[in-house]
A protein has these predicted regions:
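Conserved SAM/SAH-binding loop
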Residues: 67
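Conserved alpha-helix/loop element of class I SAM-dependent methyltransferases that forms part
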Residues: 40-59
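Conserved SAM-binding strand-loop segment of SAM-dependent methyltransferases
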Residues: 98-108
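SAM-dependent methyltransferase
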Residues: 11, 146-206
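A short SAM/SAH-binding and catalytic strip from SAM-dependent methyltransferases
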Residues: 114-134
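N-terminal auxiliary segments of SAM/dcSAM-dependent transferases
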Residues: 1-22
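A short glycine-rich, Lys/Arg-flanked "PGG" loop and its adjoining helix->strand segment in the class I
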Residues: 134-146
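Conserved SAM/SAH-binding beta-strand->alpha-helix loop
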Residues: 87-88
């Protein structure tokens, strides 16, 4: 990984913001990811993110913390947050912005337990493939304290496969339709392609049942997205 996301965050933090990140997938054309959006405050966050932050309780793990916006909001509420990201640049920015407990780490490296685990901005993305979902969910389950919760958002992207007549052109012989090849470039540098997973709610719920987690659809967004709360079976 070249960490172009981290470089973009560092450039913005250091006053060197001149252009945005360009993204695309194997089923969509190029799009712009505005870097200022990654530094948004609570009032500018989508309603699903706002809802998730309002549901937070206890000791928190912010997974894929990026520039630290969610962590800073919670810190300012007096909540203790551990913030992790695989991007060294992102964690450097978090430290500069005053995030108290930020470190470069993968979720699979974490062993301590939390009351709330946050996975936002398509939190299922880090699962990569449908076949990996139960592995990640089992690990996340092991990180929950009794009465703990996982707050995670994603989208059902089936709509991206609709043709003009409303029919679907999903290849039934291909992988799950939410598994995408995700491409990023910044200032002419291309990131190593990622596999990024968008997961419809029913598929997430079924995977949770497999590993012994309850899965509740807390709120639906305006564009096939949703916020789910996962809890331990009592």
């Amino acid at each position: 990984m070249k960490d172009i996301l981290g470089q973009a965050l560092l450039d913005y933090q250091n006053g060197n913001y001149t252009e945005d990140i360009i993204t695309s997938t194997n089923i969509s054309d190029e799009d712009i990811l505005p870097i200022p959006y990654l530094f948004r405050e609570f009032k500018d966050m989508p309603k699903l993110e706002q809802k998730a932050l309002k549901l937070v309780k206890g000791h928190v793990l912010d997974v894929g913390c990026g520039a630290g916006g969610h962590s800073l909001y919670l810190q300012n509420k007096g909540i203790i947050v551990k913030s992790i990201d695989i991007s060294e640049g992102a964690i450097s920015v978090c430290n500069t912005r005053g995030v108290n407990h930020a470190e470069v780490a993968s979720i699979l490296d974490i062993t301590e337990q939390f009351d709330t685990i946050l996975l936002l901005m398509n939190g299922t993305g880090i699962f990569e493939k449908l076949s990996y979902v139960t592995k990640y969910l089992s690990h996340l389950k092991s990180l929950l304290k009794p009465k703990g919760q996982i707050l995670i958002d994603s989208s059902d992207i089936q709509y991206m496969y609709e043709d003009e007549d409303g029919g679907l052109w999903i290849d039934t012989n291909a992988n799950y339709y939410g598994e995408l090849d995700y491409y990023m470039s910044y200032k002419g540098v291309k990131e190593t392609p990622l596999t990024w997973l968008y997961l419809d709610f029913e598929t997430l719920k079924n995977a949770c049942l497999t590993v012994g987690l309850n899965c509740e659809n807390v709120q639906e967004g305006e564009h096939f997205d949703y916020l789910a709360k996962l809890t331990l079976n009592e």
